[in-house]
Amino acid sequence: MATSFTKNGDEYLWLRDKNFESTDRPRCGIPILFPNCGKPDDGVHHFGGTAYPIEVHGFADLVPWQVKSADDSAIELTLTPNGLTKFVYPFDFALTMRYTLTGSTATLALTVANTGDKALPFSVGFHPYFAASKLENVAFDINAATCSENAKGEQPAAPETITLTRKEGSADSIRLMTGVKSPMRLSDSGSGHKVAVAFDESVFTNAVLWQQDAESFVCMEPWNGWANSVNEEGRHIELNPGESKEFKWSVTIE
């Protein structure tokens, strides 16, 4: 998981120290979401008639990865099944995560390979926490087909200007978007930060804006599924045995 991205000594990612030092699900940096984005209905996936409990956003950041290679501008890590993953996700797979830094752009590429003998169902997303002076100072430049606070049911058309505001009585602020065009941008009038998130629109079809508890961050997240997608036919990715697929996106400090 990426934990820092700086330019001229200025930090653009947000790190929650207590959370990062604990064994809890990471809620800072740039978590990897696999094999699900969000929390499925009743907190379970159904495979072959059996219900498997799964964490919010899956397990990719709850288990150790192995460093495959590293140099001054890139690092590559791998993850294969273990006892924990088999308990919640009864499939064979290989994940390869490559981080590459070029100037003011960090490129993140996740390759998912099906190493088993049956179809591999999953969704993928990323959850970057960008440092923010406060939510009211952050403006977004995002072109999307739909935008709502709930992924279920008919989705309303997105407004010309998408905003993220705190709902009275709620600790969370969220926008769920489909048909999102690349890139998405945010600018913070308080800190002067400007960030662009670019991605392959055929791979990352959805996106999420999220903020919680008036903390000093805002999330602008590329996803290709929703919370219950892995349980819904036609709403998740399936790789046949021997197949692989790359999910690449980038963050640029502007």
Give residue spans per PLM region:
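Short, hydrophobic/aromatic beta-strand segments
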Residues: S4-T6, K118-V124
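Acidic/His-leaning functional-site neighborhoods
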Residues: Y52, H57-S69, R166-R235, P241
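Coil-to-beta-strand transition motifs
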Residues: P90-A94, L101-T107, D117-P121, E215, ...
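Asparagine-centered strand-capping/turn motif at beta-strand->loop junctions
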Residues: L110-G116, Q211
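Active-site/ligand-binding surface loops and adjacent short beta/alpha elements
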Residues: A119-P121, P128-S202
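Extended, loop-rich substrate-binding clefts of extracytoplasmic carbohydrate-active enzymes
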Residues: T50-G103
